[in-house]
Amino acid sequence: MSISSLFGGRYDNKFLLNMSSAPKIELIVDKVASLSERRLEGRLPEDWFRHIMDPETEFNSEFADALCIGIDEFAQPLPFLPFKALLVTGTAGAGKTNSIQTLAANLDCIVTATTSIAAQNLSVVLNRSKSAQVKTIFKTFGFNSSHVSMSERQSYIANDERSIQIQQKQDLSIYWNVISDIADRALGAVACKTKELPDLCESSVIVIDEAGVILRHILHTVVFFYWFYNALYKTPLYEDGIVPCIVCVGSPTQSNALVTSFNPLTQNKDVKRGIDVLSALICDDVLSKYCEVDNNWIIFVNNKRCADHAFGDFLKHIEFGLPLKPELIEYVDQFVKPASYIRNPMNEIETTRLFLSHNEVKNYFRSLHEQVEVTNRNNLFVFPVYFLIKNKTFEDYKSEIGNFSLEIEPWFKSNIHRLNTYSQFADQDLSKTVQLEEIVLEDGSVEETLITCHLKHIRNSSIGVTSKIKASTVGFSGTYEKFVELLQSDLFIEKTSCDQTIHAYSFLSGLMFGGMYSFCCSKFTTPEVLMEIKNIKMPSIEFLESEMSRMSPDVQTVETDERYDFGLVNDGLSDVDLLEIDPCGDPFFTRYSKLPLTNSLSFEEISLLYTTFKDIFISRFAILQKHTKGKFGKTLLVTYNRNNVSRKQCGEIYSHLKSFYGMLTYAIPANNYTLEGYTNDNVVHLGTDKQLPQILYKKGLPRLVIKDEMGFISVLDNNVSKFIDVVNGQSFHLCTTVDYATVSKVSMTITKSQGLSIQKVAIDFGSDPKNLKLSSIYVGMSRVTDPNNLIMNVNPLRLNYENDNFIAPHIVKALKNENTMLIF
């Protein structure tokens, strides 16, 4: 008998699994609280943090590129910096995030993640306000864009018998180029008293989500900066000698930390696999023993993302390294469909394709775009991407690397993966041909070279953003039912930070105002409906009427004005059309013909306006629902904030006022969006970047229009990013990229999908995969939320694959250890 059958189907399996694990998840709080109470047995040397010797010189006396923190002549060897660690691992979708939620709710802790997507996802899960967004662990300890090009170095290893003290120094030495730069800047900032208190001074409990994708030396880097910052600012944590507790969360069988190096002289890139934090804590005897992993390991067992019993059993066999019995291999056969079916973009349109390599993803997009171009050209958007190369800086760069024959175009093609988010250019259908032109200034001088490429996207396709991007939410597109549900639940208001609440109320009022006329224009509207609509009580709003009396009907509104003249709605309609719609005029717009500026009203007045419009809107909705027996609610509502908006056949969305007025928001990587189109109109709050040359706007720089999962429409700001390369300690700002920071979610690599929950998945393992790994099979198949929505071109378990799950024996050993906390 299944658990759910005991409850008569009242609760689903996912709910029951989460509830059954809740009591033990709460025990994690006690475990972390206990570890975070540890204190130093003795004090660290006084002022140890002001002048620190490069740890590499302790292993290699002939090391020529030593970098000391502070003043070289005062530098002393780095003392050992103690720490505690707790390991929280589990199968995909097992509920590890629940443990983070519980810790955040019950303890004063610093919650971080290793990637932007994971950080934004946690911000959503924890319902963090704009001012308290979860940061990446890199940003938390002070990493910034100037450190991207700083190379990691190899540490000299004298022998294999290493203590934890030596291991810590060797790990820090690998990352010392970055560490020393951040530390020197922090010392300078304190001297100038310009630095705010760093995040690592807030608590001794530091949570790192998705710890399986960062290299092991980052663990010791976090420990170093905890002690460094707290010593620098003389915090109570430091004065009391509180030892940091690092909570490392992730799935060790999904770990995939990479070491990337770039040779400026040859312009060649080298990528190889490194040892991640989770693997180091589990497999490294020295580190594992010091952190007492045998006593400090929590394992989540059941997959709660997909509660299908057979599928969960299959995933657990891979997770724990159990032998794959013939019946399990036969079980996977049911997901197989022909490769030609999966590779045809016209099949399974709403399904996300996963591939092993970036080239396969790119080829799929090209095939998809070719078909769309033939079947419906207007659904294929082609957007320009610009790269501004600084000519003088490029010449200085050539001199520094000693490659005087290097030209801009070959350099660009070799470095495009470094100029912005790798997957954006590695996966997408970016034009092979590039256009180079020199930007000539008014005095005739040439300082920059402009490179133009083109990027393709499909209308109504699923997209994501590569980083947190400023946007202006301007409208709504969805059913009437959905919009009324949002109004009644106040979901939009709840998801808005407190400091933005007045703007949220004003924005929703503008949407209701713009959509109110649609009740009279609906195909379901009858004379009886119109009479009932006219009988709806519309209270007098004193401040609105006084505002109207101050407005002359002849005054022209400016682009940034929130006033809205409903007469614009009827542009293009004849008098006969208007009479057929409503011969007596809509009483709503007779009483409330204009909306005042948000900044001219108090919060109480905006709230009253919102409540009044909401009551009228819902009353009109109820009337039409009653007369149509619920059919009206299923119809489409498209409304924009205080604006009339139209769409051209080519996908361009334009305002009749030549300007969009919306609510300032942000698009984040954790969310899914639909590409609605693009606009060339002005967007209030976004404006133009004055640092960019005007030639870009003359050539064309559209903004993308997207829709979120709730149905709200936003205009994305353009993404401007700088590429700074570091060679021999010298920084070179070589390029500024102007693009859209978007990636299609129609297809991606299996590696990139890690950590995502996907409704429908189609995996293409290739025709004859040479480097197929068990971890790739596991990650790809475990993304799906329902195995009925999973298809694959082959059964990968019947192919030759590398069993790279070297963690499994350690997990099995931990499962047998009575000190391991198991959460089912």
UniProtKB/Swiss-Prot annotation:
Protein name per Swiss-Prot or TrEMBL: DNA replication helicase
Enzyme Commission (EC) number: 3.6.4.-
Organism: Human herpesvirus 6A (strain Uganda-1102) (HHV-6 variant A)
Assembly, per entry: Associates with the primase and the primase-associated factor to form the helicase-primase complex.
GO cellular component, one term: host cell nucleus
Gene encoding the protein: HELI
Family that this chain belongs to: Belongs to the herpesviridae helicase family.
Superkingdom assignment: Viruses
GO terms classed as biological process: DNA replication
